[in-house]
């Protein structure tokens, strides 16, 4: 839910909000000569006021994705002279201390004013919004280092304490102090114990006349049952892992690599900042370098950080090195490591955002990075799992084992709590070769606990309730059957069918389930012709791709195929842009863009997509038309000023994104779809889904000739 944000200059005695782009007027020193006019035109210094980490801490966690563009025209050949004791050029250490003292004095005054206001009014205060920046630097390419012109440069800065100063070259004079304030939100107060999207503490953003400076501030999306949306939850986890050192720790006489303490995780989660940056030549002037940066900031109180860490444990993203499970995340004294599932999620986040930090790459290259997760399809509006029969059958094939059952020789080994057998996600649930159930000896049986363990460790489920729901659907669709109930376990109200995630509940694969997973010969496909939703025969690759994209089960298989083919970014971009444009048209229809905050937030999302998929050298750079790429670059790097021009800019960006989406659609339909339909690994499954008429002729094609698929890689990592 977007928050209301207003920007207005403050008078000398006005109390600043908890987040301010603070730009004090220069104070001439009696001992320092005034700077020359030429020097003042060449450069200026912006000093940010150090602020406390949370002047008004209500215990609300926050998450915000911000993006902005600031144009600063500095002649490439201009050099800035130095003046001792002056704010122009290089500043001596003594004067830095004087600026810090001035900053502290102004901060103390601001906090005093805040306190006086708090004693005379009932209105509540929250942390307010800040913004990232996209800066356009007027420097020649010859003046840049190799790292600057090499393309996408991700930034993973250390945690910010909310204080500090920055220096920014600009030809513009200082502007009046501006503040961002936020109105209290009653809904937020009712959701005090949920993760919330609010702004970061401080960003040192210079203000210039030609700028696009937007702030994105919104509540973190929550589901009906008060859990964060899966994508946001995984992004929060991955950002935390990138911020940690993940070095070696010793426990008694054992050394554990790539680990972290519970205290480090809680402290870092209290204030996280992730930035991704992209440098490229200006399409209109190659001698200028344009830098686009998207900043995401998470912030929350200590107890909430502890609760979120426990959610990471419950989702099997991290685990204690001693293998012991605790229902409450310890404040200190415990050592944790990423699970294979957590490493896989971190890897996908790093590939999308181009993260190449050495300590993260070491984890991704470690022997523990073996998992191939089943990426479950979710509803974009509610985040609920797709639960149609076809999608559940796709999940079931991996659950049961595509190459046969994962049989253990004894009941004790099949029922053990060890999860090492699931380290790669390519084998099915652990089954006992023979088990006595009542008076019968049954083959290939498994427990209810083994089923939910596999679903939690080998798929993108994030809480146990989702695993039970999927297992219930296995029973409902006749894929598994119960052989022995756990009578000591109470029945769950409002459940679809009875499924018990217990060690004492015994289940087996039905005959239909064995046919679905390929253990038994399939029935002969029906000789029918199917049509798409518009009644048009699917006689073209475009229509075939439309059918695949509209079917969650086929879309899941198609994504897996593209991942093995090293071009999954095409489908990811298509789906992400579909969500973005759908939201845009929905807001536009109801007049939501009359609010400047909605425009700024939507533009921030647009820059996130652009930096990930479309900017030159981005980690998941797409293969699109050169002219379209230049049009996108020109539009995304153009400075705008007032709210009307930002809305016009957003409209143009949406049109260009839709053109890029069409280009990617044509690429997938002409190149990927024919190969997907001819792949022998999927041909039998496609027949089972009544899409046998989609399968084209010609030789078979498979990007994965071996049993173990090649890992997904972003385009920037391919050689």
From Swiss-Prot:
SMART domains: DEP, RGS
Record's keyword annotation contains Kinase: no
Domain of life, source organism: Eukaryota
Regions of compositional bias (Polar residues) in chain numbering: 1-17
Spans annotated as Disordered: 1-39, 117-141, 155-190, 694-719
Keywords, in A-Z order: Signal transduction inhibitor
Biased amino acid composition, Low complexity: 123-135, 158-171
GO terms classed as biological process: asexual sporulation; conidium formation; intracellular signal transduction; negative regulation of signal transduction; positive regulation of sterigmatocystin biosynthetic process; regulation of conidium formation; regulation of secondary metabolite biosynthetic process; regulation of transcription by RNA polymerase II
Chain segments carrying region Fungal-DR: 214-411
PANTHER family: DOUBLE HIT, ISOFORM B, REGULATOR OF G PROTEIN SIGNALING
UniProt-listed SUPFAM superfamilies: Regulator of G-protein signaling, RGS, Winged helix' DNA-binding domain
Domain DEP, residue spans: 425-511
Name recorded for this polypeptide: Developmental regulator flbA
Short name of one Pfam family: RGS
């Amino acid at each position: 839910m977007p928050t209301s944000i207003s920007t207005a200059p403050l008078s000398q005695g006005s109390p600043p909000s908890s987040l301010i782009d603070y730009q004090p007027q220069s104070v001439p020193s009696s001992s320092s000569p005034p700077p020359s006019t030429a020097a003042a035109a060449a450069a200026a210094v912006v000093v940010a006021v150090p602020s406390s980490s949370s002047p008004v801490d209500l215990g609300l966690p926050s998450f915000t994705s911000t993006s902005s563009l600031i144009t600063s025209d500095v002649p490439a050949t201009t050099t800035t002279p130095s003046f001792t004791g002056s704010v122009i050029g290089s500043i001596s250490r003594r004067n830095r201390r004087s600026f810090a003292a001035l900053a502290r004095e102004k901060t103390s005054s601001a906090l005093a004013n805040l306190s006086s206001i708090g004693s005379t009014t009932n209105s509540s205060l929250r942390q307010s919004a800040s913004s990232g920046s996209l800066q356009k630097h007027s420097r020649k390419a010859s003046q840049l280092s190799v790292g600057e012109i090499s393309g996408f440069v991700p930034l993973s800065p250390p945690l910010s304490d909310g204080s500090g100063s920055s220096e920014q070259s600009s030809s513009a004079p200082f502007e009046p102090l501006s503040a961002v304030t936020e109105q209290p939100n009653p809904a937020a107060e009712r959701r005090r114990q949920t993760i919330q999207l609010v702004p970061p503490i401080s960003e040192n953003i210079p203000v210039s006349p030609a700028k696009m400076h937007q702030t994105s501030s919104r509540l973190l999306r929550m589901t009906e049952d008060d859990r964060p949306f899966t994508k946001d939850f995984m992004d929060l986890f991955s950002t935390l892992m990138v911020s940690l050192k993940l070095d070696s720790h010793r426990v008694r006489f054992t050394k554990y690599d790539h680990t972290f303490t519970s205290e480090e995780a809680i402290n870092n989660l209290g204030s996280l900042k992730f930035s991704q940056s992209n440098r490229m030549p200006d399409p209109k002037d190659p001698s200028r370098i344009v830098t686009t940066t998207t900043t995401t900031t998470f912030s929350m109180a200590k107890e909430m950080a502890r609760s979120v860490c426990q959610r990471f444990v419950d989702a099997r993203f991290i685990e204690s090195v001693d293998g012991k499970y605790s229902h409450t995340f310890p404040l200190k004294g415990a050592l944790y490591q990423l699970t294979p599932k957590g490493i896989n999620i971190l890897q996908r986040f790093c590939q999308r955002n181009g993260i190449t930090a050495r300590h993260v790459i070491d984890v991704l290259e470690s022997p523990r990075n073996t998992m191939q997760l089943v990426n479950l399809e979710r509803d974009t509006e509610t985040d609920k799992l797709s639960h149609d029969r076809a999608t559940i059958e796709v999940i079931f094939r991996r659950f049961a084992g595509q190459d046969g059952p994962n049989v253990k020789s004894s009941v004790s080994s099949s029922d053990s709590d060890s999860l090492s057998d699931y380290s790669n996600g390519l084998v099915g649930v652990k089954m006992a070769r023979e088990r006595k159930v009542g008076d019968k000896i049954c083959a290939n049986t498994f427990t209810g606990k083994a089923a939910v363990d596999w679903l939690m460790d080998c798929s993108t489920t994030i809480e146990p309730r989702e695993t039970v729901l999927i297992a219930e659907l296995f029973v409902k669709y006749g894929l598994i059957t119960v052989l022995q109930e756990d009578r000591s376990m109470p029945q769950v109200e409002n459940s679809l069918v009875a499924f018990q995630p217990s060690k004492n509940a015994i289940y087996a694969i039905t005959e239909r389930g064995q046919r679905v997973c390929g253990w038994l010969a399939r029935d002969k496909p029906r000789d029918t012709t199917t049509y798409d939703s518009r009644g048009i025969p699917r006689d073209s690759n475009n229509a075939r791709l439309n059918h695949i994209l509209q079917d969650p089960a086929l879309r899941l298989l198609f994504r897996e195929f593209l991942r093995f083919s090293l071009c999954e970014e095409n489908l990811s971009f298509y789906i992400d842009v579909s969500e973005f444009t759908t939201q845009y048209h929905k807001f536009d229809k109801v007049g939501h863009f009359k609010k400047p905050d909605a425009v700024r937030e939507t533009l921030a999302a647009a820059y996130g997509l652009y930096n990930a998929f479309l900017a030159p050298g981005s980690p998941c750079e797409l293969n699109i038309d050169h002219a379209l790429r230049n049009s996108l670059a020109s539009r995304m790097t153009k400075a705008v000023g007032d709210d009307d021009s930002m809305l016009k800019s957003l409209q143009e960006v949406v049109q260009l994104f839709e053109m890029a989406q069409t280009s990617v659609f044509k690429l997938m339909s002409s190149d990927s779809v024919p190969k997907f339909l001819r792949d022998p690994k999927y041909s039998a499954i496609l027949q089972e889904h009544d899409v046998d008429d989609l399968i084209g002729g010609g030789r078979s094609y498979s990007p994965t000739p071996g049993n173990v698929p090649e890992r997904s890689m972003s385009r920037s990592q391919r050689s």
